[in-house]
Structures are given as C-alpha cells and as structure tokens.
C-alpha cells in the first residue's frame, strides 16, 4: 500500500512519480472539500509561521489564505529588516524560536539551500517557499496540478519553457517533476540564460525528452507554454540584464499562431515578457494557475502536519 512520507517540502527531487500522482489525487479531494465549504476547521488549533525574508505577494498570500481557509492561524515576518536577523541572529536560532511558537513553518529566503538549514534546526515541518535561484517546490507542484487540470493529462504533452532558464527557480523545480512523465520540452532562452547543467543531469534516465533553442517560434508546437520573466534581482551585472530583459515577448499574435488550445502559464509577476493582450484568450491560464495554488497548498499543509482529510 502506498504511504506518503514527506513532512518537509524542500526540493522537487524528493518526490517520486507515485508521490506526485498521490498529491494530485489528494488535491482533487481538498478542492472538493473547499468548494463544498467542508475544509474549514481541518487545521483548527494549528499555527503557521510565515517567514518571508525575500519579496513575495502570491506565494505568501497563497499560503496564508490556505491556512486561514483550513481554520488554522498564522504569525508572520516579512523582510530581514523586520526580524532579529537584522540584529545578527542566525537563521538557526530564529528557527529554534519559531519551533517554540508554531506547528509548521513556511520560509522564503534569498540564499540557496537556506530551507535545508531551517529544517535541520527544528522538528516541526518546514516548507520551502523559494530559496534564491534554487528551488520553489510548492510552485512546481501547483504548476503540475494546473497542467493536469487544464489539459486533463501530462503524458505525451509538448511543453515550452520561455525566458530565464538560468535563474528561474520555478523552471528548475517544475522540470524536476516533469522528468517522471513522457513529455517533450522546448527550452527557449538566449544562450546566456540556458538551463544550468546540473538540472540537465537530473533528467538522465527518465522518460522526458528535451531540446534547446533560441527561437521563440518553437512555442507553435507546444501544448503548454510556460513563460517567465528575466530575473533582474539574480544578475551579478545589471548591464547584462538590460541587454536581455526584453529579448522575448509572448503576445496575442504569437499565441494565435500557435496550436488553438496551447495553454499559457506564468508563475507571475510578469514584466514585459507576457503581453496583457493575451489575458482575454480562453487558453490564458495564469490567473487560474494562481487560484489552484491555494488548494494545492491547503493539501500540502495538511499532509506535512499529518492531518487526514479523506
């Protein structure tokens, strides 16, 4: 009998295909409970620490909404300047204090690997909400759930990733999940922002196939197009960012030249890479994608806390 065993959610490499299929099933169940008004109270008496040491709108509010909709409560800190870390306190010590207050912690931090440090300090569950240019596992899980919800399947899809494949942690994370499925990827980026080799190595021995290109017209063959912004805050040289920031733009004309049902995704926020004239197309799914994020995180909070919701 299958048993899900992930208390902490730190990295997409921790998930097997069985885990992913189980999470999709459990999220469907959570969505049904939520829509029927029966999810509220499942986490009554539980307290979430929402620790965001790097800017966030969607992820922070999504987790906080998820906890509130389950009947739990939360305490939060936003930015280094509003925490004792600004006084020199280590992340380890901060987490030891959080453990005394809360049942579960969600953390976003600009340093890659920080979530592992946080999880290593405490016995409560820790969920990585983004660590620098590294991983963003819950975004990847909601992206996978969005693809299933919008397309009805994963197997056999052609999926295009467009933009910053070097620094885009949402791409790094989602590719690690998609490797378990027989899909084909178009990795569309300028040469300077190719997918790093360490992520390509993770794909070896899996049923996924992929190809790299600089040509945005590869989107025409895609069933799903995942657009990302160029990550300005990750560039060591701002001149390089200025050179690349507007290299791709997905607009209505490009989408209409693609397959009729190409699903357009974006983790948001967007800058110039995705035109607002796409918003009114029925296959523009990025706002639905954000909505799916709440029920996915509702399911993950319950599973990490070991709370049953069958």
From Swiss-Prot:
Sequence positions that bind carbamoyl phosphate: 58-59, 108, 136, 139, 268-269
EC number: 2.1.3.2
InterPro entries linked: Asp/Orn_carbamoyltranf_P-bd, Asp/Orn_carbamoylTrfase, Asp/Orn_carbamoylTrfase_sf, Asp_carbamoyltransf, Asp_carbamoyltransf_Asp/Orn-bd
Highest taxon of source: Bacteria
Residue sites binding L-aspartate per the record: 87, 169, 229
Main EC class the enzyme belongs to: transferase
GO BP, one annotated term: 'de novo' pyrimidine nucleobase biosynthetic process
Protein family membership: Belongs to the aspartate/ornithine carbamoyltransferase superfamily. ATCase family.
Protein name: Aspartate carbamoyltransferase catalytic subunit
Taxonomic source organism: Leptospira biflexa serovar Patoc (strain Patoc 1 / ATCC 23582 / Paris)
